[in-house]
Every structure is written in structure tokens, then in C-alpha cells.
Amino acid sequence: MNFKELGIDQDIVDALESRGITSPFPIQEQAIPLALTGQDIIGQAKTGTGKTLGFGLPTIQRVVGRDDDQWGSLQKPGAPQALILVPTRELAIQVGNDLSVASKLRNARVATLYGGVPYEPQVEQLTKGLEVVVGTPGRLIDLYQHGALTLTQVRTVVLD
């Protein structure tokens, strides 16, 4: 089985292959087809078994990017459409990096938001527009309470 057979778009497959990722792990084979349809899923697997791409690839594929036909029909183009909550800064960075690799050939912009770093560059990322937010609860709550993070367009939420 390969990612294309799971329903992943060719641009994402190409981005993965450019990094040597060609075959899905078992958790990905189980999760991806369900997640692509928008179903709620719960996945559990050991560290290093591919959970991030199991939820991340469908998330990237399901958002509407700047060059997509549906972009103009969005209520607020550039507002986040997917929110991925992670418990630590380190995991936020890892998940953000993995999703950035997968979205390299796609119009899905990914921002990684967490505390312990300057606030303003993260607000600037949100202002410029993006499709996927990966972040820690504390920083996301802060950005939301200050009006920098809009959640009205979020249709995918992941708790990692």
C-alpha cells in the first residue's frame, strides 16, 4: 500500500517522496482513509510509528488553499481552518515541521505557535493568513483572548 492508494493527493505524495517517505505505517493506513472523509477518529500508537502524518496528511489535504477554487467562497480567507493542539513546545515544533514538509507543494500554510518566544512574529503570521495552526494551549489561548487568533473557520481539530 502507498499514500496515493490511501487517497492522498499527488502533490502531498511528491513532497513526502522528496524526503524519502514512500510507504505508510499501519496507523496511517488505518487513520488516513477515515480522516479524509471528515470522520472523528482516535488513534493510539507508540512514539515514532507515524501518528503525526496519520492525522496531518488528511488535515493538509482538507484545507482550502489560496489557489483552490473554493478560496473565494470562504467566509474569511486566510483564517485558520485546522487547529492542532499539542502539549509541549518541542512537539509543536516537530508536528509543525512535519506538516510543513507535507504541504511544501501545496497552498496550505502552517504556523507553529508556542510560548517562550516573542509574541509579535506569531501575531504577524496570523495576520498574513494561514490554513493550519499547530500550537500549545497556553499560547493559543493568549492569542485568542487578544483577538489575534480567529477560530470561526476551523473545521478540523486535532488533540495530539
Model-derived regions, located:
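SF2 DExD/H RNA helicase N-terminal ATP-binding lobe
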Residues: 2-160
